[in-house]
Structures are given as structure tokens and as C-alpha cells.
Amino acid sequence: MDISVKQMYNIEENGHAMGFLKKFMMENAGAAAARLLDERLEGAPRVLAFAGMGNNGGDALVAARHLAGRGADVTVVLLGNPDGIRTEEARWNWSILEKMPSIKLVSGGSFDASVSPDAIIDGILGTGITGEIREPYLSAIKFINGIQCTKMAIDAPSGLDPQTGEAADPCVKVDFTVTFHRMKEGIPKRKDLTGDVTVQKIGIPPEAEKGVL
């Protein structure tokens, strides 16, 4: 059953109210994303994770931590300043990475466009896209689309509206997308952008859907 973005929001709120906190959802989402990417890579890959300032970015931060634990050489690009991270869950995960010298952290929105990773994680916008794509997101999306490597989007490719399937210009194009709990209505409409799509459960109790679906 495909669901709307609003329904997903309400399910998450219900789960949080039950005691399955959003930080647990973020941990499980990021861990699932890391596992799926790791299965597609070999050796000790170089992974470049782009993180926006919301919970989609938080998922990418968790994935980066798990991939470092699996032996990957990880660089995280936070597309803004750390004090601008919008959610408690994402801030908490950034604070963990600050204590991990095994991960290279870049913040402020700038990044080295000469890098050549084996894989890229798109955790820029997710389900939170509104309006025109602006800097520094614009440059990050163009960079992702211009480089040859394995690319994974978390929740939805940045620039794709997971509710309607409408895409901004530019919009990230990836090899595969991992979305969570249930498929969002707009995602299957743009397989040209999403690549293979996998739905991963992240531990949200089925009771959280009561009154929503």
C-alpha cells in the first residue's frame, strides 16, 4: 500500500508518542541505508555523503557512521553550518560524528569538487522539498549528477517530490533509492530518477498506523 507524505508524517508522530522515538527511527533508517549500500560495494570504498539540514540529512549521518564501522573511507558534507541543523535527532547524530576522527567532516556548504568517491549518498532533501532548489543544494545536486559512481538516495532523490512525482530542475538521479516504512505515492512515477527502489521497515509499530490508514 502506497501512502502520502502526510500519512507518513502522522505515522511517525504516532510512533513517537508511543515511545518509539524519532531518534530510533533515524537510527534504523540510516543503518538500513548503510547496509544496502555496503552490499553493492567491494573492499574499503570511498563514500561521500551529502547531508541536508533536516532529518533526511540525519539519516545520512547515521548511514555514514555505520559505513565507517564497516571499513569504508567516509566523508560527510553538511550543506550548512552545524548550528543550523533543524532537528534534535540530526543534531545528536552530528555530535557523534564530531567525536569520530575516522570520518572526514566538511560543513558550511562548500566541498571539494575534485574528489572521486566510489559511492555517493544523497541525504539532502528527502521528503522535505519546497520551492526552487537554492545554493548550496544546487551545486551539490549538479555535482552528484556529474560524477560517475554508485549513487543512493535516502527516502527520495533530492528534487523529487515524493508526493506528486514532480521533479525540480535539477533533480538528483541515482542508481537506487531506499525509502522507509511504506512506499510514498509519487516515488514509483519517476523510476528514471530513483533507479531501483527498496522499502525498508524501521521498527515503527503497526499500531502507529491506527487512525491514519
Swiss-Prot record:
- Superkingdom assignment: Archaea
Name the job this protein performs: Catalyzes the epimerization of the S- and R-forms of NAD(P)HX, a damaged form of NAD(P)H that is a result of enzymatic or heat-dependent hydration. This is a prerequisite for the S-specific NAD(P)H-hydrate dehydratase to allow the repair of both epimers of NAD(P)HX.
Cite a single Pfam family from the UniProt record.
YjeF_N
**PROSITE patterns per the UniProt record, alphabetical:** YJEF_N
- The species this protein belongs to is Cenarchaeum symbiosum (strain A)
The annotation note on the cofactor reads:
Binds 1 potassium ion per subunit.
An example Gene Ontology molecular-function term: NAD(P)HX epimerase activity
Required cofactors, per record? Answer: K(+)
InterPro entries linked to this entry: YjeF_N_dom, YjeF_N_dom_sf
Identification of the protein by name: NAD(P)H-hydrate epimerase
